Amino acid sequence: MVLFIISSNAYALEPGKWSFVQEDEYCYIGSLATETDLPENKIRGDNYILVYRIIGSNQNIVQIEAGYNYNTEKNILVKIDNTDFDFYTVEDSPDSAWTDDDNKVIYAMKKGLSLIITGESSRGTITNDSYSLNGFTAAFNDLMNECK
């Protein structure tokens, strides 16, 4: 597992838009949440979702960044339209989450309209982040065609 941490400002990720970025060793597509229900008195860092690929690899990996440390004892729920997927986090990078079903998640993202991530912080705060999947398929096609 490779951990990618980017600044959403550095690569101009936008809410509701899927952006393609190519670097020397990897490429990714990403988006910011269109809506989040974090309580007003809580603070968090950048939160976004990526699909990345190492150049020369044929593996596409879905990664979520929460902007806070997840509760490592609980799964993160990703709901794409009416289908649920479990993501997990690890102690070495508690603000990130992955799945063992990347291809299934990507397939659902290509077919879906919306994605909602429900996670619990290490302090017990539950968040729901909503993402639009409009434009995901076009961005994913760029990833597949340009990142070889």
Predicted feature descriptions by range:
Residues 11-148:
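A generic "folded-domain core" signal
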Residues 5-9:
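N-terminal signal peptide c-region/cleavage motif recognized by signal peptidases
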